[in-house]
Amino acid sequence: MSKFVIWTSELDSRLSKKYGRVVPRNLAVERPSIEEIEEAAKSLGFKVLQVEREKLNPKLSGIDEDLRTYGRIIIESPYGKAKTLKIIAQKIRELRRRR
């Protein structure tokens, strides 16, 4: 099992890769909240170790306040970080469709 940090900005479709988006834009979601990421991770069976709602990804310190998303979550997953992020992004899209 791998432990790693997931920043909300890594899943945000509004951001370029320069500012921290990791997943492809077609899989990313607009303005993902830390609560959505946590819910998706738990529903997928990943262990959530820590949630920090006020943290800002250092890559976002130089951009407009409108584009900043706060929060990071530390999880444990059997997959690598890139695959885990893609799975979580797909789950968030699914959860949003249900609402």
From Swiss-Prot:
Part of the signal recognition particle protein translocation system, which is composed of SRP and FtsY. Archaeal SRP consists of a 7S RNA molecule of 300 nucleotides and two protein subunits: SRP54 and SRP19. It comes from the Archaea. Its main location: cytoplasm. InterPro entries: Signal_recog_particle_SRP19, SRP19-like_sf, SRP19_arc-type. It holds the Pfam family SRP19. GO terms for cellular component: signal recognition particle. SUPFAM superfamilies: SRP19 (SSF69695). GO terms for molecular function: 7S RNA binding. Keywords: Cytoplasm, Ribonucleoprotein, RNA-binding, Signal recognition particle. Belongs to the SRP19 family. It comes from Pyrococcus abyssi (strain GE5 / Orsay). It is found in: Cytoplasm. Involved in targeting and insertion of nascent membrane proteins into the cytoplasmic membrane. Binds directly to 7S RNA and mediates binding of the 54 kDa subunit of the SRP. This is Signal recognition particle 19 kDa protein. GO terms for biological process: SRP-dependent cotranslational protein targeting to membrane.
